[in-house]
Design a protein with these regions (language model features):
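FNR/FR-type flavoprotein reductase catalytic core
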Residues: 80-163
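Ferredoxin-reductase
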Residues: 2-90
């Protein structure tokens, strides 16, 4: 396996999907196309600009567009590092290492994917990669839902909430 190196990704877009939940599209340089190496279920380590936070933040990959050298991350603001990322705008850069992790091994045939809360985003890349019938069960705390519409073209979607 090739050694992963740190590179600078450029923010292409960022939006708030739900309170505290952000969608971030990153573009990668042609000479180190992280998107071409990524597969569903992997994650990226994002580094803060602030030297006081030495450890990177692991964020799962939501969507992969290898042809455009882009990856979409959907994350929850949970501390100072992710709060910093939520303020990034188009054209800003973020230091990234990845893709990391083993990822999923897609198989043909019927698939049932189950995810809740911030565990939902990696299900989108997986659902898009599967052949055959796909059903997705999503769990949310309340009626504020994210990524349901994104998953609908690729799977039958079922939702459960705590409220």
């Amino acid at each position: 396996m090739a050694e992963k190196k740190k590179c600078l990704a450029t923010v292409k877009s960022q939006s708030e999907l739900a309170p505290g939940i952000y969608s971030l599209w990153l573009a990668f340089p042609e000479e180190y196309n992280v998107a071409a190496m990524a597969k569903p279920g992997q994650f990226l380590s994002l580094y803060s600009d602030d030297g006081s936070r030495l450890l990177p933040r692991p964020i799962s990959i939501c969507e992969i567009d290898a042809a455009k050298r882009m990856i979409r991350l959907v994350y929850r603001v949970a501390g100072a590092g992710t709060l910093e990322f939520s303020g990034k705008q188009e054209g800003d850069t973020i230091a990234v290492v990845g893709p990391l992790g083993n990822g999923f091994t897609p198989r043909s045939g019927k698939s049932i994917l189950i995810g809740g809360g911030i565990g939902i985003p990696p299900m989108l890349a997986l659902a898009k990669s599967l052949s055959g019938e796909v059903q997705v069960v999503l769990g949310y705390r309340d009626a504020v839902q994210f990524l349901k519409e994104d998953l609908a073209p690729y799977a039958s979607v079922y939702v459960s909430t705590e409220d």
